[in-house]
């Protein structure tokens, strides 16, 4: 079962496996959401309150103290918080998916990718709920949204898939080298400041112009989708160059193909004997 299928068919195989087990995935998503929100008094409202409070705090620290004058800055930060949180949670959650669920693998032949996908989809649900936190900002600042806002979910899907794909590459090795989980979590914390959460794409281009540093910055896989989210919601135009989209597209497909291949090839071997 684990070695006869061609490694090159891994992306298609994993997609098919998860479609076949979609009922289980729904139950896992419900389990994760209930575990997080059933106890607290405010329940699912925390999915809105948390990014809202974070955006207000970050806006105060970076906006008032540093001196940002953009009246839409809190909304800009809110979008960055939602996008980055989805990517970071998908990355760190997938990285430890094998170690977190190792006890289940001893008793079932369920494809291991099911747990990674259910975690990613749970993060999607939370991110879509978090978007409602933007409504007060849009009303307060009188921002009129147009039909381009329907593209926002595709940006979120891209962020979650990239984070999950990179996590799939690391997850099998994190079973035998647990320090990798801590390293990834550290990188995620540092990456927050290196990503357009509290700063914007125009700030990046204004700082580095069109030089090599600016081009290399597009290797950060969240820059393009978060910037596009802001453009779609706020009606702005950040002027991302064609090579920026090309670099993100390359990173997206490369990480997805490599992630599914590595996970399909290594996950079972690494888990055996735990």
Each model region followed by its residue ranges:
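Hydrophobic transmembrane alpha-helices and immediately adjacent juxtamembrane helices
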Residues: 1-274
